[in-house]
């Protein structure tokens, strides 16, 4: 092989034909770029040598917890960051966490209602797990935890009567300017 042809040859990353490898590649693609449709995602996977049917891709997206969120002037797929350490590190400021929660609430929060120490947050279908995970990762001190369904997040306040204040905070996050 000549020096010229050796310079042209690019190494090719091989992706195993396993469900785990396919889902890892899907998560990586959704994290790296805005993907607006399953057809676009299937084309990106095909470019990587991963052939997938629409039904399999749909199941993979559900299993990954992918949801469609508003970004770049339209809806794009997003995957929650699973396995992330929930303890904030020094590099992550309160301002960053508040800005992230503001953005997510502006994109996902439909309503917030409280009763005693409980807050019920409504989201578009399929987005509740994404919002609940973001709340859990933000480590808000007055929140004990969350439980998510398809379009509903139950937030449990530490204070027996703190639900109203937390509901109000989420509504403020959703209404802040610049979102």
Curated annotation (Swiss-Prot):
Pfam families for this protein: Arg_repressor, Arg_repressor_C
Coiled coil: none
Subcellular location: Cytoplasm
Biological process annotations from GO: L-arginine biosynthetic process; protein complex oligomerization; regulation of arginine biosynthetic process
Keyword line: Amino-acid biosynthesis, Arginine biosynthesis, Cytoplasm, DNA-binding, Repressor, Transcription, Transcription regulation
Disulfides per UniProt: none
One GO cellular component term: cytoplasm
Lineage: superkingdom: Bacteria
Pathway(s) where this gene product acts: Amino-acid biosynthesis; L-arginine biosynthesis [regulation]
InterPro entries cross-referenced by the UniProt entry: Arg_repress (IPR001669), Arg_repress_C (IPR020899), Arg_repress_C_sf (IPR036251), Arg_repress_DNA-bd (IPR020900), WH-like_DNA-bd_sf (IPR036388), WH_DNA-bd_sf (IPR036390)
One GO MF term: arginine binding
Functional description taken from the UniProt entry: Regulates arginine biosynthesis genes.
Family, per entry: Belongs to the ArgR family.
Name of the featured protein: Arginine repressor
């Amino acid at each position: 092989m000549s020096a010229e042809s050796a310079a042209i040859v690019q190494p090719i990353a091989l992706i195993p034909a396993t469900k785990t490898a396919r889902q890892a590649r899907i998560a990586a693609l959704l994290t790296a770029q805005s993907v607006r449709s399953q057809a676009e995602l299937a084309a990106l996977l095909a470019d990587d040598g991963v052939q997938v049917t629409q039904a399999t891709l749909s199941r993979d997206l559900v299993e990954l917890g992918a949801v469609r969120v508003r970004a770049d002037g339209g809806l794009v797929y997003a995957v929650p960051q699973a396995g992330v350490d929930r303890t904030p590190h020094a590099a992550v400021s309160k301002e960053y966490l508040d800005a992230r929660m503001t953005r997510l609430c502006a994109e996902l929060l439909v309503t917030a209602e409280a009763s005693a120490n409980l807050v019920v947050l409504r989201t578009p279908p399929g987005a509740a797990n994404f919002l609940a995970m973001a709340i859990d990762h933000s480590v808000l001190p007055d929140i004990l935890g969350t439980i998510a369904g398809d379009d509903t997040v139950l937030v449990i306040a530490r204070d027996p009567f703190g639900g109203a204040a937390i509901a109000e905070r989420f509504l403020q996050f959703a209404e802040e300017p610049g979102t």
